[in-house]
């Protein structure tokens, strides 16, 4: 603000009056200073003077509060005008013998605007759209010296004189990505430098702009189309081309169940991954929603997920353990809408139940009965399986395959007698010679003469018992030489006899043919002559 005008010194004022009014003549009234610029509510001293020496009347006419100062002379007076709120034109007047006259001083009041306000910006502004900035200014004078400036940061966007009350200045800006986070403001400039004062500035509160880019394409949602009760599934929602991506909000929900995703951000993309658990209360068709909110816009993708309950099929045996020859019923039951097969045989008619009847045999022991159920859910085939095993109790068995009846081993050789009984439960097996000497079944032994003989093998279980005789022959070394010699001699004699027979036979055939040729009797083809 400019300081108040200084009070003129009395000697200087007198000199001035003497210079202005050097002698008598027509009466003239003067005012000093003729022009004043002062802050609103300020005070100013105004001097009124006249050219006559003895005026009948000298004063000032003004609506402003005034006070005559003591200093003064016959033809001049000094007044203090206070609380100047607006432009004013106080008028000095004088009444002299030779006439009346007046003079005005022009008071110009300056003050900065009472309100400089930038209209609120949208909370979010899409990139590529026009943004209108609007600034309103109330008050401020003199208006001829008042300018309104719109700014982005420190960059001027528009400058206009303040016109009207309130003054309003607008401009349009095409929003860009790099405008995100920029501050916009409005500033007034009251320039009184030409009047010897200064530049007065008032700036509005800044408004920060938030820009965004949200593509028109909906987010991509990947999830299972069907989900079984009491299981978990994974849902992934993603979208590319967002700005600023960290400001994007992602909402994932299955029906009324809000999911809690883990969000991973890229440069301009995100991926939200969440686990979803379903219970029997959720069974049926549910809506899966992925919504992305950025700025004042949103994009949404919907999918349907079918929640189903499908327990594994139930395989029922009359008894899991039966004796040989017992009638057994095997049943397979599943979900009412499922189709079942039992050991590959489908139900007739096709449905959720199938059964099989059989008479238990030893071959059925350990047999698995597999029930497969298939349920169609939302166009997908769901498969479940269940297997049960049948145990058949049957008596002991000893046969040639598992327990050979005759063994012939060389003396002093290492041998392992093998005899295994079958049955369920597994029978106890003992092989004894003369009721006391055991055969070391399954053990590696050195064959001696004591091992030779006939053993009675007895297999016993809760299902009965069975016996089988087993003979062990032990060959001593001398018997082996005799046997080898006899066998070799037999081979030699047999070979010699066969050679003699073949030689004599060929000789007789040639002799017969010669006799027939001498008699002139042709030989009959394909007829073999009988030897003499």
From Swiss-Prot:
Keyword tags: Cell adhesion, Disulfide bond, Glycoprotein, Immunoglobulin domain, Membrane, Phosphoprotein, Repeat, Signal, Transmembrane, Transmembrane helix, Ubl conjugation
Gene3D superfamilies: Immunoglobulins
Signal peptide: 1-27
SUPFAM superfamilies: Immunoglobulin (SSF48726)
Residue window of motif Cell attachment site: 152-154
Domain of life (superkingdom): Eukaryota
Membrane side Cytoplasmic: residue ranges: 504-532
Any one GO molecular function term: integrin binding
Bridged cysteine pairs (disulfide): 48-92, 52-96, 135-186, 237-290, 332-371, 403-419, 419-457, 431-457
Ranges annotated as spanning the membrane: 481-503
Biological process (GO), any one: cell adhesion
Residues bearing carbohydrate: 145, 183, 202, 267, 296, 385, 406
Membrane topology: Single-pass type I membrane protein
GO CC entries: plasma membrane
InterPro entries cross-referenced by the UniProt entry: ICAM, ICAM1_3_5_D2, ICAM_N, ICAM_VCAM, ICAM_VCAM_N, Ig-like_dom, Ig-like_dom_sf, Ig-like_fold
Main location: membrane
Extracellular side: 28-480
Subcellular compartments: Membrane
Residues bearing the modification Phosphothreonine: 521, 530
Pfam family, one: ICAM_N
Modified how: Monoubiquitinated, which is promoted by MARCH9 and leads to endocytosis.
Domain Ig-like C2-type: residue ranges: 41-103, 128-193, 230-297, 325-378, 412-464
Function as written in the Swiss-Prot or TrEMBL entry: ICAM proteins are ligands for the leukocyte adhesion protein LFA-1 (integrin alpha-L/beta-2). During leukocyte trans-endothelial migration, ICAM1 engagement promotes the assembly of endothelial apical cups through ARHGEF26/SGEF and RHOG activation.
Protein family membership: Belongs to the immunoglobulin superfamily. ICAM family.
Subunit-structure text: Homodimer. Interacts with MUC1 and promotes cell aggregation in epithelial cells. Interacts with ARHGEF26/SGEF. Interacts (on T cell side) with CD81, CD247 and CD9 at immunological synapses between antigen-presenting cells and T cells.
Protein name stated in the entry: Intercellular adhesion molecule 1
């Amino acid at each position: 603000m400019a300081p108040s005008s200084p009070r003129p010194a009395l000697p200087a004022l007198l000199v001035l009056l003497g210079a202005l009014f050097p002698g008598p003549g027509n009466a003239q009234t003067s005012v000093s200073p003729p022009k004043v610029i002062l802050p609103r509510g300020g005070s100013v001293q105004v001097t009124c003077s006249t050219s006559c020496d003895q005026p009948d009347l000298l004063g000032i006419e003004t609506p402003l509060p005034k006070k005559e100062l003591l200093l003064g002379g016959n033809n001049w007076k000094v007044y203090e005008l206070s609380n100047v709120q607006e432009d004013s034109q106080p008028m000095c007047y004088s009444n002299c013998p030779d006439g009346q006259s007046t003079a005005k001083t022009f008071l110009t009041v300056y003050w900065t605007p009472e309100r400089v306000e930038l209209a609120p910006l949208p909370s979010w502004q899409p990139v590529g759209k026009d943004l209108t900035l609007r600034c309103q200014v109330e008050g401020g004078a003199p208006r001829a010296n008042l300018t309104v400036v719109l700014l982005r940061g420190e960059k001027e966007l528009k400058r206009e004189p303040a016109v009207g009350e309130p003054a309003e200045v607008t401009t349009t800006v095409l929003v860009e990505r790099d405008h995100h986070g920029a501050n916009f403001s409005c500033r007034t400039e009251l320039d009184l430098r030409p009047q010897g004062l200064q530049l007065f500035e008032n700036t509005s509160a800044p408004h920060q702009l938030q820009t965004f880019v949200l593509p028109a394409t909906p987010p991509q949602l990947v999830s299972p189309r069907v989900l079984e009760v009491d299981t978990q599934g994974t849902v992934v929602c993603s979208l590319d081309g967002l700005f600023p991506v960290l400001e994007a909000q992602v909402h994932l929900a299955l029906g009324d169940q809000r999911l809690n995703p883990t969000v991973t951000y890229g440069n301009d993309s995100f991926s939200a991954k969440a686990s979803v658990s379903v219970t029997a209360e959720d069974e049926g068709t549910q809506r899966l929603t992925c919504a992305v909110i950025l700025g004042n816009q949103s994009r949404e993708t919907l999918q349907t997920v079918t929640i189903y309950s499908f327990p594994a099929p139930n395989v029922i045996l009359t008894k899991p353990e039966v004796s040989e020859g017992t009638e057994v019923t095997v049943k397979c039951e599943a979900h009412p809408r499922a189709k079942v097969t039992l050991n590959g045989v489908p139900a007739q008619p096709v449905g959720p139940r199938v059964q099989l009847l059989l008479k238990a045999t030893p071959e059925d022991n350990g047999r698995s009965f597999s029930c497969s159920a298939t349920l169609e859910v939302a166009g997908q085939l769901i498969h479940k399986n269940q297997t049960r095993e049948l145990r058949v109790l049957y008596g002991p068995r000893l046969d040639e395959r598992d327990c050979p009846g005759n063994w012939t081993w060389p003396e002093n050789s290492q041998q392992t007698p093998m005899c295994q009984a079958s049955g369920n439960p597994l029978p106890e097996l003992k092989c004894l010679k003369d009721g006391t000497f055991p055969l070391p079944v399954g053990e590696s032994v050195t064959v001696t003469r004591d091992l030779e003989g006939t053993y009675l093998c007895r297999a016993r279980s809760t299902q009965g018992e069975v016996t089988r005789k087993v003979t062990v022959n032990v060959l001593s070394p001398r018997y082996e030489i005799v046997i080898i010699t006899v066998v070799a001699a037999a081979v030699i004699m047999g070979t010699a006899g066969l050679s003699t027979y073949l030689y004599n036979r060929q000789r007789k055939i040639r002799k017969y043919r010669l006799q027939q040729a001498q008699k002139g009797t042709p030989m009959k083809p394909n007829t073999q002559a009988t030897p003499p």
